[in-house]
């Protein structure tokens, strides 16, 4: 790894390349049927194998002055290899994210007021989407190809907040925070499901579920 401080430790840069090998990794076998009924043998639906994770991590910080904060970026790959899945070849782990970026900044307006901002971006999680379908006894059966070969949409959002700290005393400290979560209302995907399209018989449509689009908030903190 690489680490260096500048300007009397006011600025800091760290970079590291890593590789990690993992054993006893768990995943569901192809066509697993998971139920949580009493007596259900969940372990029969699991397979065990190995994994690996490697990549580059970078972070830069500014630690003094009116403007403080940090930028971090990770370029990574996380994979599994389990006999019985994906033709016994390496495949993307569910939590694999190629890019992961965070930017955090705080600006002190005066001794009582400060402004803060956060921006995050990451590649969507690896998932397995259906590639086809067929009808069996009146039910739609989806077909799948390689494990985790698809991606959820990228996740990103921006948060802003303003914090007010009244005068302090020896016995009590307090602050008010006024913030906005997901400033530009990004509809980040929580889940994507597939169903028959009633408007176009014989076709399939994807339904995206999103949570927490634009959320204003007020927080009061105190400590003795």
PLM region spans:
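Transmembrane beta-strands of outer-membrane beta-barrel proteins
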Residues: 11-15, 69-71, 103, 115-117, ...
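Membrane-embedded beta-barrel scaffold of Gram-negative outer-membrane proteins
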Residues: 1-43, 175, 179
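Strand-connecting loop/turn motifs
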Residues: 6-10, 62-68, 98, 110-112, ...
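C-terminal beta-signal and adjacent terminal beta-strands/loops
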Residues: 112, 121-138, 155-159, 163-224
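Transmembrane beta-barrel domains of outer membrane proteins
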Residues: 1-5, 59-63, 72, 106-108, ...
């Amino acid at each position: 790894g690489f680490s260096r401080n500048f300007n009397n430790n006011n600025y800091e840069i760290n970079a590291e390349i890593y590789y990690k090998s993992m054993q006893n990794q768990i995943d569901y076998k192809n066509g697993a049927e998971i139920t949580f009924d009493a007596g259900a043998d969940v372990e029969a639906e699991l397979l065990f194998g190995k994994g690996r994770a490697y990549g580059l991590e970078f972070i830069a910080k500014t630690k003094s002055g009116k403007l403080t904060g940090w930028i971090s970026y990770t370029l990574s790959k996380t994979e599994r290899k389990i006999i019985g899945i994906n033709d016994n070849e390496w495949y993307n782990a569910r939590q694999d994210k190629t890019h992961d970026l965070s930017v955090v900044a705080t600006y002190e307006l005066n001794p009582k007021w400060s402004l803060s901002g956060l921006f995050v971006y990451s590649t969507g999680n690896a998932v397995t989407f259906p590639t086809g379908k067929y009808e069996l006894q009146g039910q739609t059966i989806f077909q799948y190809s390689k494990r985790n070969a698809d991606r959820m949409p990228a996740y990103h959002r921006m948060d802003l907040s303003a914090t007010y700290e009244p005068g302090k005393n020896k016995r009590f400290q307090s602050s008010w925070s006024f913030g906005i979560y997901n400033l530009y209302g990004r509809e980040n995907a929580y889940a994507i499901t597939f169903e028959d399209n009633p408007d176009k018989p014989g076709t399939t449509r994807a339904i995206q579920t999103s949570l927490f689009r634009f959320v204003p908030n007020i927080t009061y903190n105190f400590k003795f």
